[in-house]
């Protein structure tokens, strides 16, 4: 493991805007890829006559390996800059990308938003159905404030490398982000060409008009979020493995608090208690884990069948909250008709996904000011923001957003789409026996 400070990065943006190529380029220039993997990807791309897509092939290759090789550590994609050690926590292009973005974004310290400057592509991303808009809204709701906007495909503008087009995109995307409450001092824009690496790790000869930092230099300007080590322990579980000769190994990211070898932890909602025998991160044994660490930890006293993805490990004296009902502020992103009381979408929160029924529409609010505009509305439609009450259909750990951000923000999914996103304001706890 690198001794540099570690940041988790998510790469977002509309389909076909060049996310994979950009990630591949970063990994190739600054990453942990060996020549062999790169060569194989180049050959695979050549065979299919898609030379320019070798980076995307590279990612597919890595993804396959990740899906095949079940190891304790979460072998995310990693690269280093002068200042930081980065983990890319989701390679885009995934069917479940929005859902992953919500469960994954709870882990991201910053985002690279890839926006194509090509005529037609940029407009598609910013249309009502476009993922550029959707991902911007999601990033904000999920608490990602640091965003680097990589305006890609600058070689395909008309004329090529057009400064005017770049400025137009900066202006429009900037206005949109500002309207959703982004602090624009933490949002940076850089014109890039992903396949050639222009303005990614090296300066572009073709865009002399741009004198700002490269993407890599902007990555080095990111700020490290403070570690919430003083809060009670919370580790949402991503996977649970049973490893011969070791025992039960839950895997997850420490969101708050500190986990030490020898600690007793409780898994909620089941209420089972286990003792931590060892902790690993990226194949390295460690004595204690802090917020931001992706770990596998071996526990004694718990069986594999007792715990599952979506459970949360926490401290015994302040155990994770199991919700009987919770109050949330939501934004309806997309719904074909309207959302009313009784509507039951699947709520994706931290690593869990559980259907939750809306039991009350308390008030409709202005998303930009947060002020109430209507009491007890009959229904909500796309674009509306509201305070609602929700009841999980089965046991679910939910925390207040202001106390445990990663366990208090969620997405609502239905019909294969993200219907809305929200943050938890209050929780009515359910009594769970700790055994």
Curated annotation (Swiss-Prot):
Pfam families on file: GTP-eEF1A_C, GTP_EFTU, GTP_EFTU_D2
Protein name (database record): Elongation factor 1-alpha
Primary gene name: tuf
Binding site for GTP: 13-20, 90-94, 152-155
Example of a GO MF term: GTP binding
GO CC term (a single one): cytoplasm
Segments of this protein annotated with the region G1: 13-20
NCBIfam families in UniProt: EF-1_alpha, PRK12317.1, small_GTP
Family as reported in the entry's similarity comment: Belongs to the TRAFAC class translation factor GTPase superfamily. Classic translation factor GTPase family. EF-Tu/EF-1A subfamily.
Chain residues that bind Mg(2+): 20
PANTHER family membership: TRANSLATION FACTOR
EC category: hydrolase
Domain tr-type G: 4-229
Organism of origin: Sulfurisphaera tokodaii (strain DSM 16993 / JCM 10545 / NBRC 100140 / 7)
The enzyme's E.C. designation: 3.6.5.3
